[in-house]
């Protein structure tokens, strides 16, 4: 999760540097394979970020619903899961690249899915966001159903308390994903507005990146409180 977040932030910083340089040297162009590759890696990092939450959701699901199978909770298994997570991320974004969805924006000096390209936005949404978010939501829904309908009849009070803690973490993961989805809706709405009116505000791309940056900030803050080690740090510094 943190690796994908770091890669995404590094690419965003690189994009800002290119954009700033382009505004200072208006005749320059950065169109090319490297521009396309950076856009591809940015979406790979985003896909990997969502899959990291799916992996956490699967872990919590196994701890709660499959607690009698410790083999599904081993460290080695989830290391393999991380490898699979990144393989899926690289593979899923390849169609976005091959379909020519990434465009060079001459006024912004970088490549991305243009905000007026609703087809491209839908392809990116389907391949990058929908699959991991849908699976994570299914894990969340089934875990909630299990705790409410089944868990109380077969587990001890101590096990139920552990389940509640795991479910709380899973709930916070769902809140983070909801925040990320909500952050992308304004940009998507601008794309739909362009389809109906043929008018695209000049600040649309900047607004898209502003909403994405704001979402990263919110997620970073939420992650501080989601982390199970935060109470330990508080107790340590309170001493």
Regions inferred by a protein language model and the residue ranges of each:
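Transmembrane alpha-helices of multi-pass eukaryotic membrane proteins
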Residues: 1, 38-39, 76-82, 121-129, ...
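Membrane-water interface of transmembrane alpha-helices
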Residues: 53-58, 139-152
């Amino acid at each position: 999760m943190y690796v994908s977040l770091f890669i995404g932030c590094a690419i965003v910083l690189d994009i800002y540097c290119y954009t700033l340089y382009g505004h200072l040297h208006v005749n320059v162009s950065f169109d090319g394979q490297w521009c396309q590759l950076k856009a591809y890696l940015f979406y790979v990092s985003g896909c990997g970020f969502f899959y990291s939450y799916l992996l956490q959701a699967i872990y919590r699901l196994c701890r709660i619903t499959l607690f009698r199978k410790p083999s599904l909770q081993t460290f080695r298994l989830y290391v393999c899961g991380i490898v699979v997570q990144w393989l899926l991320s690289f593979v899923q974004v390849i169609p976005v690249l091959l379909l020519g969805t990434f465009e060079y924006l001459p006024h912004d000096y970088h490549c991305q899915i243009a905000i007026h390209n609703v087809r491209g936005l839908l392809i990116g949404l389907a391949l990058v966001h929908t699959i991991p978010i849908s699976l994570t939501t299914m894990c969340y829904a089934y875990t909630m159903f299990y705790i409410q309908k089944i868990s109380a009849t077969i587990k001890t009070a101590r096990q139920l308390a552990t389940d509640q803690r795991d479910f709380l973490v899973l709930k916070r993961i769902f809140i983070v994903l909801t925040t990320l989805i909500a952050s992308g809706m304004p940009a998507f709405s601008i794309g739909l507005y362009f389809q109906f009116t043929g008018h695209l505000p000049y600040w649309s791309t900047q607004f898209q990146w502003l909403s994405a940056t704001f979402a990263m900030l919110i997620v970073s803050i939420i992650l501080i409180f989601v982390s199970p080690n935060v109470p330990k740090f508080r107790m340590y510094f309170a001493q």
